[in-house]
């Protein structure tokens, strides 16, 4: 988690059903650890966000075994080539992931597409949790957040 807490910013990438999970992961890191993080659709990297990649920047890549897997891995290789430290979250085994220079890999259990989003979300929640703990923040009482939001 220090890679994320010490960085100027981080990026979360996903395609298909993993894109909203990437957004949620970035949001949780912002809400709990007060670290700048943004979620982006992996397929849109060449339209701007790729320019934000700096050497050592932490990037979470959600790459479940789905129709977008190969394209997501290609996007991951692009950010690695620009110096990003990639945390890959996938339901493929390390031996099946054909990419070198991945900083960390978290392999979740394989499940059907209805359940897989839950399995991909847990590592992101733990990342935010441990990042907040490392910085000494109260996980149960994030600043400026309420359990319910009402607008009148």
Question: What spans do the regions from the language model cover?
Answer:
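A SIS-like phosphosugar-recognition module
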Residues: 1-152
């Amino acid at each position: 988690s220090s890679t994320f807490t010490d960085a100027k910013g981080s990026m979360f990438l996903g395609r298909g059903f993993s894109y909203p999970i990437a957004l949620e992961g970035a949001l949780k890191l912002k809400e709990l650890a007060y670290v700048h993080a943004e979620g982006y659709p992996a397929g849109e990297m060449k339209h701007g966000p790729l320019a934000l990649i700096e050497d050592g920047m932490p990037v979470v890549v959600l790459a479940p075994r789905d129709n977008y897997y190969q394209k997501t891995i290609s996007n991951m290789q692009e950010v690695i080539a620009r110096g990003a430290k990639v945390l890959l979250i996938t339901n493929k085994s390390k031996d099946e992931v054909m990419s070198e220079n991945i900083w960390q890999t978290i392999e979740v259990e394989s499940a059907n597409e209805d359940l897989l989003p839950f399995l991909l979300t847990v590592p992101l929640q733990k990342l935010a949790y441990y990042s907040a703990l490392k910085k000494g923040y109260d996980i149960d009482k994030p600043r400026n957040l309420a359990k319910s939001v009402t607008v009148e």
